[in-house]
Every structure is written in structure tokens, then in C-alpha cells.
């Protein structure tokens, strides 16, 4: 993937950039793997805002992605197409399996049309192949990792994401997350070899507010600039209280200190200026 930078013909085009989409091989999705996706505008079933700053945006269709893959052990698949997915930052790859079935997966870096991908404990260690962590050599970079055996991929699914398998200790594998955290995961959990493609996605500059609206992002207004009736931070009186949401919920360090999964964390992610 490469980034195309616009010439500054207008204020909105100055410094704006876009993907050149050169890796894509098809512009329309596989019809059998597409479902309707309704917009919520950040509202729940009562019509109340539960997720702020969402709404509008271009219409989308949801592409069904195979995050499990374990039911295709031993069945090779050919990469038929590399496609755009409006619902995620990564590209997706359309696989044609030897048994005739078609499925989408997240497209790993370096994968191309015509490549053959395998699933199962005996699969080779090459980008796109999916196998248990216990069968992957230490030091390998992986993505689309399960947190529980057969639970489906949960970790490292966005563009450019990569996790390194740093050690194996009995029934657990130690993973170094993109945040720097080192975490134990059941060695029976599956992962896909390689890193997620479209790694230059983080370098794209929207350039204008309108492009943010196209993807469904609404403006953010600081609570401090509101009136007291609209937000706890509103009004001219400053300081004296910790930052909160418009409904008075704490907005800083909201992770539960006794979370059950804490015992799986070997080393917490670096904080503050030590973060990379």
C-alpha cells in the first residue's frame, strides 16, 4: 500500500492524503458474504445516546469475516481477491477453498492473488496460515489471535497490527502486544502468521471535517465550553473536580483494578512518556 498526497488546490486538500488502493483486485464484494448493516447513530433501543460523536456517514454493507477458521483444518484455500472493507481499517481477502466454499479473512501483509493458504496444526509458518500458538515457533509475528480456544480471533485485527510470540511456558504462550504489554494466552488458541496489511493506514490525513463526517464521526465539543446545564464541566468555574462524562461518570482510569484477566498479564504496558 502507498499513500497518495493531494496537491493543495483548496484548504481542504492541503496536507490531505488517501490510500492509492493499488493492492485491491476487485471493487464489488462477494454477494453471498454480504449482510445489511443498519445505522444506530450511537443510540440504544430507547433512542438515547450511549456512544457520543457518532452519526451520519456513507451507507455500508457488512462483510462476513471468518475469525475462527478451525472448521477448515486441512482444506487448502486460494486467495481469489483482495478487497476494500468499509467496516475496518484492514483489507480483506476472499478465499476459495478446495471444497468449494468461499470466505473472507483479514488480509495479512504480503499476501497476493493466487497464494495458497492453509489451516491446521500441520500448516507451514508463512503469512496467512492459521494454527495453534503451541505449533508456532518463538519469535514469530502473528495477528488475529484468540483469547480462548475456539473462541474466534479477538486480538490484533486492525491495519498494521502485529503481536510477537516471545515465549512458551507449559500450557501458556507469552505474547508481546502492540501496546508493549506482555500477556499469557492459552497455547491452544489459534493465531494467523504475519502482520495485518495496509500498514500505512495510520499515516492517512483526512484533511477536512467533511471526510470525518463521511466515515460517521461527528464533532467533539469540550465539556468546559458548555453551560452548567449541559455538562458537569460547564460554566466559568474551573478545576476542583476530576474529569467526568456528561452524566458524571469518571473518564480517567476506569479499568477495574480487580479484573479477572489481570492474572494473565505478565508485564503491564508502559505508561506516560515511556510509551512508544
Curated annotation (Swiss-Prot):
One Gene Ontology CC term in the entry: large ribosomal subunit
Entry keywords, A to Z: Ribonucleoprotein, Ribosomal protein, RNA-binding, rRNA-binding
InterPro entries: NA-bd_OB-fold, Rib_uL2_dom2, Ribosomal_uL2, Ribosomal_uL2_bac/org-type, Ribosomal_uL2_C, Ribosomal_uL2_dom3, Ribosomal_uL2_RNA-bd_dom, Translation_prot_SH3-like_sf
UniProt biased composition (Polar residues): 16-27
Biased composition range(s): Basic residues: 255-276
Protein's UniProt keywords contain rRNA-binding: yes
Known partners and oligomeric status: Part of the 50S ribosomal subunit. Forms a bridge to the 30S subunit in the 70S ribosome.
NCBIfam families per UniProt: rplB_bact
PANTHER family xref list: LARGE RIBOSOMAL SUBUNIT PROTEIN UL2M, RIBOSOMAL PROTEIN L2
Annotated protein name in UniProt: Large ribosomal subunit protein uL2
Gene, per the UniProt record: rplB
Amino acid at each position: 500500500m502507498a499513500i497518495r498526497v493531494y496537491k493543495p488546490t483548496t484548504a481542504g486538500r492541503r496536507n490531505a492524503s488517501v490510500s492509492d488502493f493499488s493492492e485491491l483486485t476487485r471493487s464489488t464484494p462477494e454477494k453471498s458474504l454480504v449482510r445489511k448493516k443498519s445505522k444506530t447513530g450511537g443510540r440504544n433501543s430507547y433512542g438515547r445516546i450511549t456512544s457520543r460523536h457518532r452519526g451520519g456517514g456513507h451507507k455500508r454493507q457488512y462483510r462476513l469475516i471468518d475469525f475462527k477458521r478451525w472448521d477448515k483444518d486441512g482444506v487448502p484455500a486460494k486467495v481469489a481477491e483482495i478487497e476494500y472493507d468499509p467496516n475496518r481499517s484492514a483489507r480483506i481477502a476472499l478465499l476459495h477453498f478446495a471444497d468449494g466454499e468461499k470466505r473472507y479473512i483479514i488480509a495479512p501483509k504480503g499476501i497476493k492473488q493466487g497464494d495458497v493458504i492453509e489451516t491446521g496444526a500441520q500448516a507451514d509458518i508463512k503469512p496467512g496460515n492459521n494454527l495453534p500458538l503451541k505449533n508456532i515457533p518463538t519469535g514469530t509475528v502473528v495477528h488475529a489471535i484468540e483469547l480462548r480456544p475456539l473462541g474466534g480471533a479477538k486480538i490484533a485485527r486492525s491495519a498494521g497490527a502485529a503481536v510477537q510470540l516471545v515465549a512458551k511456558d507449559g500450557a501458556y504462550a507469552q505474547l508481546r502486544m502492540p501496546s508493549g504489554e506482555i500477556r499469557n494466552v492459552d497455547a491452544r488458541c489459534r493465531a494467523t502468521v504475519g502482520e495485518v496489511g495496509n500498514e500505512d493506514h495510520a499515516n492517512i490525513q483526512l484533511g477536512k471535517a467533511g471526510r470525518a463526517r463521511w466515515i460517521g464521526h461527528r464533532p467533539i465539543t469540550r465539556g468546559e465550553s458548555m453551560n452548567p446545564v449541559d455538562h458537569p464541566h460547564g460554566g466559568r468555574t474551573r478545576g476542583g473536580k476530576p474529569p467526568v462524562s456528561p452524566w458524571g461518570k469518571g473518564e480517567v482510569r476506569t479499568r477495574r483494578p480487580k479484573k479477572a484477566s489481570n492474572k494473565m498479564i505478565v508485564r503491564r504496558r508502559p505508561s506516560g512518556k515511556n510509551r512508544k
